[in-house]
From Swiss-Prot:
One of its GO terms (cellular component) is cytosol. CoA binds at G277, I278, G279, N280, I281, N392, G396. This is Acetyl-CoA hydrolase. Glycosylated; contains mannose. It comes from Saccharomyces cerevisiae (strain ATCC 204508 / S288c) (Baker's yeast). Belongs to the acetyl-CoA hydrolase/transferase family. It is found in: Cytoplasm. One of its GO terms (molecular function) is acetyl-CoA hydrolase activity.
Length: 526
């Protein structure tokens, strides 16, 4: 076959050029029930050519439900995994996913899914925890990894994400490398720590966000590599939801809080390394910081979005570490237009390092994430709507919130339903599912205000959250619930964290029955 000049330039290890294949030539390698690893994190840096070829094969041969795989990715993959879900090609998926087709398949029971702390998922995979049912002692049959270059020693230069690729390659029987020639080479911005298992594991030596070990590519045994495939498809990241009055209000509350912490000496003037999740609230917070005159900021996070480019360009941000650069097409164009300056202030690491509790605590990270709901005592649900319907997965929120110096959650105070513009309260009497406990959360912010929960007892937290964060439509209801719960608990000598179990989920049951959480009354309790 003809090898493009671009591919020859990117693949600097000559023996690999003898392994160049078209994606469709690899179809016979894939068998029903295999265990696959994909590169990628938050929809970027994922393989495209081989997954698409497998979709075409399933479509042409009516193999829906007959060619299915156990699929492991560092976090969410690109649109390919949703097409795999639509074609019934996934048996099991972990640890995080984004997209309506795959979430629908999970909630209909057609895909078995488990989520896991992203700092732990790759290492637990290498331990064999997720493949205990295998009889051949293998972990992964194939890892399909996207590269933007291959160095002279055969090692892999990833693209805009690292994720769990180092661990996947270590425990994979065979490796397929997709070299993406539609994306510029990312060589020089990665820092790769290869997995070392206990009892031989050593502490990560990093003391600042820009410290590095100096390994900028992923080592791989060339004998494992069965094929090189050229990919010419760029990552498809949809446009970000623009900030609105709600998200800007949250950002304003946070900026004011940070200024007050600096004023009282609890934070330095350049704050501490920032972690921010995904979504329009997270983007609005970063946009707010860009206009807040904070200088010499640093970032230690999972994912960098377009809003961080503003911080780089206005000189506010000195350095950022992440495991993924999830930029829209316009965002990548902005980054590549100023690539020489940009790449020296950015480091992409594996997710076991970016999300590592040891590093998060040592650096004193300020963590900011968005929950589904938070109850009056500060237990947060990040994953399961009404306790049962999976959204995306836990992700890295708990990695950061459990270990950060400041653990912050932000959310709208209310969301609309079909029958009520404020039919869903983010603040509920009892969370229908708990991912982050009351012991993990320092600050809660909604468009209504900011609740500082540090050092408060449960009853004090409840009053603070209701008064500062609940939507006005729900403040009286929540206060009434708390008053009644305290009255009941006082009679029964259980006043530490008062609840009425008979009414604890009445917001949720009322929503299911009437389309709103605005309950008419509480059940009487003795």
């Amino acid at each position: 076959m003809t090898i493009s000049n671009l591919l020859k330039q990117r693949v600097r290890y000559a023996p690999y050029l003898k392994k160049v294949k078209e994606a469709h030539e690899l179809i016979p390698l894939f068998k029903n029930g295999q265990y696959l690893g994909w590169s990628g994190f938050t929809g970027v840096g994922t393989p495209k050519a081989v997954p698409e070829a497998l979709i075409d094969h399933v479509e042409k041969n009516n193999l829906q439900g007959k060619l299915r795989f156990n699929l492991f990715v560092g976090a969410s993959a690109g649109p390919e995994e949703n097409r795999w879900a639509e074609h019934d090609m996934i048996i099991k998926r972990a640890p995080h996913q984004v997209g309506k087709p795959i979430a629908k398949a999970i909630n209909q029971g057609r895909i078995e899914f488990f989520d896991k702390h992203l700092s732990m998922f790759p290492q637990d995979l290498t331990y064999g925890f997720y493949t205990r049912e295998r009889k051949d002692n293998k972990i992964l049959d194939y890892t399909i990894i996207e590269a933007t270059a291959i160095k002279e020693d055969g090692s892999i230069v990833p693209g805009p994400s690292v994720g769990g690729s180092p661990e996947f390659i270590t425990v994979s029987d065979k490796v397929i490398i997709e070299v993406n020639t539609a994306t510029p080479s990312f060589e020089g911005i990665h820092d790769i720590d290869m997995p070392v298992n206990p009892p031989f594991r050593k502490p990560y030596p990093y003391l600042k966000v820009d410290d590095k070990c100096g390994v900028d590519s992923i080592p791989v045994d060339p004998e494992k590599v069965v094929a090189i495939v050229e990919s010419t498809m760029r990552d498809q990241v949809p446009p970000n939801t623009p900030s609105d009055d709600m998200s800007r209000a949250i950002a304003g509350h946070l900026v004011e809080f940070f200024r007050n912490e600096v004023k009282h000496g609890r934070l330095p003037e350049n704050l501490l390394p920032l972690q921010s999740g995904i979504g329009n609230i997270a983007n609005a917070v970063i946009e707010g910081l860009a206009g807040a005159q904070f200088k010499h900021l640093t970032v230690w996070t999972e994912v960098l979005q377009d809003s961080f480019l503003d911080l780089f360009e206005n000189g506010s941000l000195d350095y950022a570490t992440a495991t993924s650069v999830r930029l829209t097409e316009k965002g990548f164009d902005r980054a590549f237009a100023n690539w020489e300056n940009f790449k020296h202030r950015l480091c992409l690491r594996s997710q076991v390092v970016s999300n590592n509790p040891e590093m998060i605590r040592r650096l004193g990270v300020i963590a900011m994430n968005t929950p589904v709901e938070v109850d009056i005592y500060a237990h947060a649900n990040s994953t399961n709507v009404n306790g049962s319907r999976m959204l995306n997965g836990l992700g890295g929120s708990a990695d950061f919130l459990r270990n950060a110096k400041l653990s912050i959650m932000h959310a709208p105070s209310a969301r609309p339903t079909k029958v009520d513009p404020t039919g869903i309260s983010t603040i509920v009497p009892m969370a229908s599912h708990v991912d982050q406990t009351e012991h993990d959360l320092d600050i809660l912010v909604t468009d209504q205000g900011l609740a500082d929960l540090r050092g408060l007892s449960p009853k004090e937290r409840a009053r603070e959250i209701i008064n500062k964060c609940a939507h006005p439509d729900y403040q009286a209801l929540l206060t009434d619930y708390l008053d009644r719960a305290e009255h009941y608990a006082k009679k029964h000598n259980c006043l530490h964290e008062p609840h009425m179990l008979k009414n604890a989920f009445k917001f949720h049951t009322n929503l299911a029955e009437k389309g709103t959480m605005k309950v008419d009354s509480w059940e009487p309790v003795d």
